[in-house]
Amino acid sequence: MAAERLNSILSHLRPGNKGVAAITQKNPDDVVITLSLRTPLTKARKGGFKDTDLDYIVYALLKEVIAKSQIDPALVEDVCLGNVRSTIKPSAQLFKYDSISVNDGKAAYLVRAASLAAGIPHTAGASSVNRFCSSGLKAVQDIANQIQLGAIDIGVAVGAEMMSASGDRLNKPFNDEVLKNQEAADCMQPMGQTSENVGKDFNISRAQQDVYAAESFRRAEAAQKEGWFDDEIVPITTRVKDPKTGEEKSVTVSKDDGVRYGTTVDSLSKIRPAFPQFGDKSTGGNSSQVTDGAAAVLLMRRSKAIELGQPILAKFVGATVAGVPPRVMGIGPTAAIPKLLEKFNIEKNEVDIYEINEAFASMAVYCVQNLGLDHAKVNPRGGAIALGHPLGATGARQIATILSEARRTKAKVLVTSMCIGTGQGMAGLFVNEQS
C-alpha cells in the first residue's frame, strides 16, 4: 500500500501531469465514491420530515448506505457528519432517554449514536464538522483526506439538516474588540441582507432574479416528472404529528415536496420582498427554501473498492475553500471555482456539469455571469430555489444529484460549489466513472 501511495504522489508531481488527462487517470490510491444517495427534501415545519430529528434521519440514512452498498459495516472506519445547527433533543423515535438534551454544536454526539444504532460497530470513529452551507462537502473532504493520507480505507460522509427544529441565528454579538473590525462586524449580517448587498453592488435586478428562479423551478419540475431524481433518493419512513390533534402516524417520504409546478416569471414577480428592511429584490420565490433533508457519500480507496467488488461511481479529485467579503458572502463560488480549477489545470469549459447552490437568485445570477458559465451546464435539474437548502446537507446532496445526472448524460468532469456564510466559498471536483 505504501508503494502504491508513493507512486500515486509521484505521478501527480511529474511535470505536465495536469489537466483533464491527469484527473481522469485511474490509480490504485485514488479516492473513489461507491455510493451516493439522499433523502427527499421536504419543507421545514410543513413537510414529511417536520417532526423528524437529526439523529433519526442520520440513522435511517446510514442504514440505507449499508443495505444498498451491501458492505460489511465492520469495514467502515469513520463517519463524518456535516451539520450546521443540531437539534435540541435526541429523537424519541430512536432513543428513549427523554431527560437528555443535545445542544447546538453537539452534532458529534448525534452522529456517533446514530452510526452505532445503524449497525456500524464501535470500532469505527465518528465526528462532525461545520463550515455552514459547505458542511456536507467538508465532511466528504475530511473522509477523502484521511483516505489519501492512508489513515483509513473506507469512510462515510453525511450531510444533514433538520431546519424544522432549528434556526440559524447568532444569539450573542461578538466581543467589542472584534467588532472594531468592519469585516468582522459584517459576519453578523443576516443572509437576506447579504443577498440584497449582492443585488445592489453588482446590479442584479429583481427581474433577473425572478427569471433565474423560474428556470430553476422549470428544470426541477421537468426532472421530477421524468423521474430523474428517483435513483438519487431513498424513501425514509418516519413519523409525523397532526398539529391539531397531536396524533402521530407513520409515513414514508419518497419525493421532494418543494417543487412548485407551473411557476412563472409573472407569478414570481408578484411576490413581496422578503427583506424589505434591506432591499426589494430578494423574495420567498427567488431565494432558497427552508428545508429538511440529508445525504450520504460512501468513499474508499480505489484498490479497496476493487478488492470488495464495489461499483465505482466517481473519483474524488479534490476540494478547496476561498474567502470573499462577508457582506457579499453569496459570491463565494466565484472565488472557489477558479481556485479549484487552477489547482488541477482545468479550463471552465472542460467541466461538463456545475452544481452551484442557489442560496439566493442574486448570487446565482452573479456567479454564472461573473464566471462566464454556460447556464445550460449549471444545475440542469434545478437548484435550491426549487428543491430546498438544508444547510449541512447541501454539499453532500449536490454530489448525489450531479452523479445521477452524469450517469444519465455520460458527463465526465463535474464541479460542485456553494457560498458560505461569513464570506467563503467551497468547490469540489469529481470525475464520473459510470458507464
Regions found by a protein language model. Give the residues of each.
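Catalytic phosphate/nucleotide-handling subdomain of diverse soluble enzymes
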Residues: 297-308, 403-407, 431-434
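Flexible glycine-/small-residue-enriched beta->alpha junction loops
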Residues: 144, 148-202
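Conserved catalytic cysteine-centered active-site region
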Residues: 4, 9, 52, 80-154, ...
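Glycine- and Gly-Pro-enriched alpha-helical subdomains that act as flexible
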Residues: 171, 300-350, 368
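Conserved active-site "lid/cap" helical segment
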Residues: 13-106, 110-118, 125, 197-206, ...
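N-terminal extracellular/periplasmic Venus flytrap/periplasmic-binding protein-like
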Residues: 7-23, 28-32, 37-40, 51-52, ...
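Beta-strand segments within the central parallel beta-sheet cores of soluble alpha/beta enzyme folds
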Residues: 74-82, 96-99, 126-130, 157-160, ...
